[in-house]
Amino acid sequence: LVGSEMCIRDRKKGVVYYNDSKGTNPDAAIKGIQAMNRPTLLIGGGYDKQSGYDEWIEAFDGKVRYLVLIGQTKEKIKEAAEKHGFHDIILCEDLKEAVKVCEEKAQPGDAVLLSPACASWGQFDNYEQRGDMFKEYVRNL
């Protein structure tokens, strides 16, 4: 997850933003969570491909401080997370709002990870566009 395309640092607050928009299903997104070595605000959700989210949520394993959800799947994922005892959940209308909420909630040393476990359709043309918009929103904070 490290590289110029994947990582943006907020020098004012000491927060690192990671673009793993390619994590378009729970299995791929688990790898993004596992790569985190700091408290993480996770942006997830998107188009519903009828995936199950239990294993993805189990991968939080104390790493995820907040789950910030967008898209068609936000309520479905919220219910699954709550079933697993995870309640630090924020529902947002879109990715722009999610990035802003993460910026407000993040503490020095935290990471913000876009690893949505869902497809981008319905909000974006593809995962590349979603990732590009994420980077733009972060730069404009």
Task: Identify the residue ranges that each predicted region occupies.
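Nucleotide phosphate-binding/pyrophosphate-handling subdomain across enzymes
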Residues: S4-V64
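A short acidic, helix-capping loop that chelates divalent metal ions and anchors anionic groups
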Residues: V15-V16, S120-Q123
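Phosphate- and divalent-cation-binding pockets in alpha/beta enzyme and binding domains
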Residues: A28, K76-E79, Q123
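C-terminal helical cap/extension that packs against the catalytic core
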Residues: D54-D110
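Short beta-strands and strand-loop turn motifs
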Residues: L113-A117
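Phosphate-binding loop of NTP-binding sites
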Residues: G122, K135-L141
